[in-house]
Amino acid sequence: MPALLFYLLGFCLLQGQVTGRVTYEWMMENVKICRNDFVRTAIEVCGHVHLERESPSPENPFLSSGPAAETVPSSIKKDAENANTMLESIPNLPQELTATLFEKQPSKLYLQYLPTLKKSNVSFEEFKKIIQNIQRGVQGSSASESNTFSRKKRQFSESLPEECCKYGCPRYYLLMYC
C-alpha cells in the first residue's frame, strides 16, 4: 500500500512539472533536423505550445484564459466580406472613406496568425513589426514578383522537411503542423 502511494505521488509530481516556458529566442533558433528528428521536433514544439496555452502566466497576457476575441456570427462575417468586395469594386470612392472602413476591421494577415500568436511568447509589438515587414515586402513588389513570392512560399511549405534537413529552419515554421 505505501508503494502505491509513492507511485501516485511520483505521478502527480510528474504531471505538475512544467517543461519550461517557450521563449522567442527558442522559437527563432535555426535547427537542422532530418526525418525522425523533424517529427520529434514538431511534436516538441506543439507540446510546448499546448502547455503554454494550458498554463498561462500573469506576465504573458496573450496566454491568459478567457475569450480571445469577440464572437461574431458567421452571417455577420459574410456580410462584412460582401461589403468589402462591393467597396473595392466602386472606382470613384474617396480614399478617406475606404481607409476608415478598413481600419475598423482587423487585417486578414493578423487573423491568420492570431492562433499562433496566442500560443507563442512573442509580444504583440514584435508581432506587429513582423506583419508590417511582410506587408511592405508584398506591397513593394510588382504583380509578377508577388506571384513569384507566393509560388516560392508555396513550394517552400510543400518541402519544409527537406529544407529543414538541408539548410535548417526556425522552430516556429513547425507550428503549421500543430
Curated annotation (Swiss-Prot):
Q: Which InterPro entries match?
A: Insulin-like, Insulin-like_sf, Insulin_CS, Relaxin, Repro_Hormone_Insulin-like
Q: Does the keyword Signal apply?
A: yes
Show the PROSITE patterns listed in the entry. Answer: INSULIN (PS00262)
Q: Which compartments is it annotated to reside in?
A: Secreted
Alphabetical list of SMART domains matching this protein: IlGF
Sorted alphabetically, the keyword list is: Cleavage on pair of basic residues, Disulfide bond, Hormone, Secreted, Signal
Q: Does the keyword Manganese apply?
A: no
A molecular function annotated in GO for this UniProt entry is: hormone activity
What is this protein's record name? Relaxin-like protein SQ10
Please name the source species.
Answer: Oryctolagus cuniculus (Rabbit)
Q: What is the lineage of its organism?
A: Eukaryota, Metazoa, Chordata, Craniata, Vertebrata
